[in-house]
């Protein structure tokens, strides 16, 4: 029980680190939550004018997902899936931001790297194609997470796909405002 609580705590707290907010406050003296979509993630950092900080945010948000899961695999492997979930929830519901946060895509990508390198490659390639064609980051993220789920189901079966199904549902939930905007034609496109 103590081990499970420890995994919940460090995974959630690691996920809660708001790198987008920290970097923009540190280097631009602005609060990213008051710019663009108000989101703390890499897409909003990029849209708000700092591509370099956006890329660094993407890397750090991904790394916290990867690190949390790798620690758990090596120390408490029986709580592997719990760590996958808690690091994501930490990012989306950060304790440091009054339980608000990002959409979780970069953290999800980092978790994929902890599984193997095929899954993030599938995600990044499909995300790139969908986003380049549609110019909607949200659409690329949701469809790509479904493609990862489908691949995992076909290759590894039902039981190993449950965490990816959970991520797919969670990403739909975190992108619900984007989905509404897509349906009404008011979703912002990204300039590439």
Language-model segments: residues:
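Membrane-embedded alpha-helical segments of multi-pass transporters/permeases
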Residues: 20, 69-70, 96, 132, ...
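Interfacial segments of multi-pass membrane proteins
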Residues: 46-49, 68, 72-76, 105-134, ...
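Loop-to-transmembrane alpha-helix initiation sites
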Residues: 137-144, 156-166
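Short, non-helical or kinked segments that cap or interrupt transmembrane helices
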Residues: 30-39, 97-107, 136-144
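C-terminal ends of transmembrane helices
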Residues: 20-23, 91-100, 127-134, 176-181
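Alpha-helical transmembrane segments in multi-pass membrane proteins
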Residues: 7, 11-16, 20, 24, ...
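Cytosolic, membrane-interface loops and tails of multi-pass inner-membrane proteins
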Residues: 21-53, 176, 180-192
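Acidic (Asp/Glu-rich) catalytic motifs at the cytosolic membrane interface
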Residues: 23, 34, 42, 46, ...
